[in-house]
Amino acid sequence: MTALEVADWRRQVFAVYSAVRDATDLPAAHDLWRRERDRLFAEHPSTPLLPEDRADFTGLKVRPYDPDWRFEVVVQPVETRRMEVETGTDGIVPFDLIGIVDIPGVGQLDVWRLASYGGGLFIPIKDALAGKPGGTYGGGRYLIDTVKGADLGAGAEPASLVLDFNFAYNPSCAYDPAWACPLAQPGNTVAVEIPVGERYSGSH
């Protein structure tokens, strides 16, 4: 893939999330998100699918929308610390912990800021279904990765975010081991099962 192809992928992802943020019909917005991601995975030169997986690709395994898994949460400040992730393609990528969020029935999640060019917020999630057959990706999923467009916006309260687990998705390394992705650490691992969002079958 070329730099221009990657830029086009990002541009389209940003556009999808912009449409989701503007939507008032959340199930319809979720369906748009699912369909557009299916299209990108199937057709785009920057798809993370391996060549041998593309011919049989019929769509990502995404659960139906459940409004009970949408939250607006206030980011509570904490003492900062740094996490450095070896990505292979981009070298060591630094993240700074900027806060935590408390999610009813789920638990606490760390909120990270990308501490390099572009900045951005990053919230991965690893739940009790991770690594189980028919469950979620063993390394966890992403809720928010704003530098790459995955951003559901701010909540109504100051310093708050919209976290909607229906939009949790697998990182690229779930589909192509050539990618090295930041994965959920202990502060982004919860003991409950999160049945919505994208599932994982080992290929697509």
PLM features: residue spans?
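Ampiphathic alpha-helical segments that act as solvent-exposed interaction surfaces
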Residues: 162, 184-187
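Immediate flanking context of iron-sulfur cluster ligation sites
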Residues: 155-176
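A compositional/structural signature for long, glycine/proline-rich flexible linkers
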Residues: 1-131, 142-147, 156, 177, ...
